[in-house]
C-alpha cells in the first residue's frame, strides 16, 4: 500500500495473500504482499 510505503517502506519477508478462485479453473488467486513495517522498526538489510 502507498500509505505503508510512506510510513516506513516494505520489509521482509513477503507474505502470500490468497483470495477465493474467481475463475472456473478453481485455482486460488495468490499474490505476494510485503509486510508493512513501522519506520525504524528494521535496519537497512
From Swiss-Prot:
InterPro entries per UniProt: Myo_ane_neurotoxin_sf, Myotoxin
Cysteine pairings via disulfide bonds: 4-36, 11-30, 18-37
Keyword Secreted found: yes
Pfam families: Myotoxins (PF00819)
SUPFAM superfamilies documented for this protein: Defensin-like
GO cellular component, one term: extracellular region
Keywords, comma-separated and alphabetical: Antimicrobial, Disulfide bond, Ion channel impairing toxin, Myotoxin, Neurotoxin, Potassium channel impairing toxin, Secreted, Toxin, Voltage-gated potassium channel impairing toxin
Tissue: Expressed by the venom gland.
Chief localisation class: secreted
Superkingdom in the source lineage: Eukaryota
Biological process per Gene Ontology, one example term: envenomation resulting in occlusion of the pore of voltage-gated potassium channel in another organism
Keyword flag Secreted: yes
Gene Ontology terms for molecular function: potassium channel regulator activity; toxin activity
Annotated localization: Secreted
Protein function: Cationic peptide that possesses multiple functions. It acts as a cell-penetrating peptide (CPP), and as a potent voltage-gated potassium channel (Kv) inhibitor. It exhibits antimicrobial activities, hind limb paralysis, and severe muscle necrosis by a non-enzymatic mechanism.
Summary of subunit composition and partner proteins: Monomer.
Similarity section: Belongs to the crotamine-myotoxin family.
Record-given protein name: Myotoxin-3
Organism: Crotalus viridis viridis (Prairie rattlesnake)
